[in-house]
């Protein structure tokens, strides 16, 4: 396994939110601030990692014709367990995420990776696939959530005590004065615009890198011909 290619594919090249555009409903609904984005991203990553590992462990005994219902049973069991843990230990985060915790069961990313990777790959590969696909999605959610929070409320990391309970609720950064904020950013249309902006930036970076790579190859081939 090429580790660099493995990481690049999952974190950047085939990012589930910025490239495959999977699971956009929770991405846009729960990224009104950075903390909610981190909370949902961590929960999704945990579900991905656990379900991938379980499905890969039992892949040889899961009947091919019944695999989708079995995936859903495993995923729903894992999500329910994590939901109960969030309710018990991080109640504020549980309240903020609300209905979007159980809706992780229907997230296309989870089912897609289960069938594409976990059902066909080793436990180790499936485990790390879950981690890095989840981190890639969390990175996108965090970027969208941070920009929306800064533009819409002028703050960053407001409500950090939802994740780290011993932090006081007054601990956050104020980056913009209220009179300079753009209220559209915290509403769904603003979320769509910011997500589109991030996708455009990613595509620009990819295109720039591709052009430079082609230019370097052409220069190398020309220098070899001269020699």
Curated annotation (Swiss-Prot):
Coiled coil: none annotated. Pfam families: Rnf-Nqr. The chain crosses the membrane at residues 34-56, 68-88, 91-111, 127-147, 181-201. One of its GO terms (cellular component) is plasma membrane. The keyword Kinase does not apply. Keywords: Cell inner membrane, Cell membrane, Electron transport, Membrane, Translocase, Transmembrane, Transmembrane helix, Transport. It is a multi-pass membrane protein. The keyword Electron transport applies. Belongs to the NqrDE/RnfAE family. The complex is composed of six subunits: RnfA, RnfB, RnfC, RnfD, RnfE and RnfG. Part of a membrane-bound complex that couples electron transfer with translocation of ions across the membrane. This is Ion-translocating oxidoreductase complex subunit E. The lineage of its organism: Bacteria, Pseudomonadati, Pseudomonadota, Gammaproteobacteria, Enterobacterales. The gene is rnfE.
């Amino acid at each position: 396994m090429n580790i660099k290619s493995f990481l690049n594919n999952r974190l950047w090249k085939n990012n589930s939110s910025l490239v495959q555009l999977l699971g956009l409903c929770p991405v846009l609904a729960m990224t009104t601030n950075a903390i909610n984005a981190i909370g949902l991203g961590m929960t999704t990553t945990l579900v991905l990692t656990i379900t991938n590992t379980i499905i890969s462990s039992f892949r040889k005994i899961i009947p091919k014709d019944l695999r989708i219902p079995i995936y859903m049973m495993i995923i729903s069991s894992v999500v329910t367990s994590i939901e109960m843990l969030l309710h018990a230990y991080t109640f504020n985060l549980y309240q903020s995420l609300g209905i979007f915790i159980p809706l992780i069961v229907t997230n296309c990313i989870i089912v897609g990776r289960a069938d594409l990777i976990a059902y066909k790959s080793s436990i180790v590969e499936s485990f790390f696939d879950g981690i890095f696909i989840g981190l890639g999605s969390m990175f996108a959610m965090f970027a969208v959530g941070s920009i929306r929070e800064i533009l819409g409320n002028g703050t960053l990391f407001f409500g950090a005590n939802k994740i780290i309970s011993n932090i006081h609720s007054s601990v956050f950064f104020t980056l913009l004065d209220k009179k300079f904020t753009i209220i559209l950013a915290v509403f769904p249309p603003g979320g769509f615009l910011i997500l589109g902006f991030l996708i455009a930036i990613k595509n620009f970076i990819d295109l720039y890198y591709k052009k430079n790579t082609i230019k370097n190859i052409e220069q190398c081939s020309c220098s070899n011909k001269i020699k």
